């Protein structure tokens, strides 16, 4: 069996969510950008969808988690990180970044939080 380190990347997944420390942020909502990088040990001689992580499952999971109420992007990123890890036993590295766009602070375009293993 030929096992190779591979990386599946979900880039720039945009989601509107109602997170934030301030009540008006949770009322109005805002745009979030999600990046997920999943390191996998795959058998490259017989690649099938069942052998890897289906990125549609990752997108669906991300949308579901971002519907929850969080006051901090650290909370949403941590929840997403732990839930993605449950998708496959072949995940050996994971990096999740949640970026909050259009922050209600003058001259600040975005802020992000990243967790990686």
Predicted regions and their residues:
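N-terminal, polar/charged subdomain of small-to-medium soluble alpha/beta proteins
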Residues: 1-117
């Amino acid at each position: 069996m030929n096992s190779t380190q591979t990386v599946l990347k979900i880039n720039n997944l945009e989601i509107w969510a109602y997170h934030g420390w301030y009540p008006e942020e949770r009322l109005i909502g805002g745009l979030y950008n999600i990046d997920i990088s999943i390191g996998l040990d795959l058998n490259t001689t017989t690649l099938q969808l069942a052998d890897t992580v289906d990125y549609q499952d990752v997108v669906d999971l991300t949308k579901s988690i971002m519907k929850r109420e969080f006051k901090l992007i650290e909370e949403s990123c941590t929840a997403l990180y732990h839930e993605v890890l449950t998708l496959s036993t072949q995940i050996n590295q994971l990096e999740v970044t949640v970026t909050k766009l259009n922050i209600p602070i003058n001259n600040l375009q975005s802020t992000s939080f990243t967790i990686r293993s």
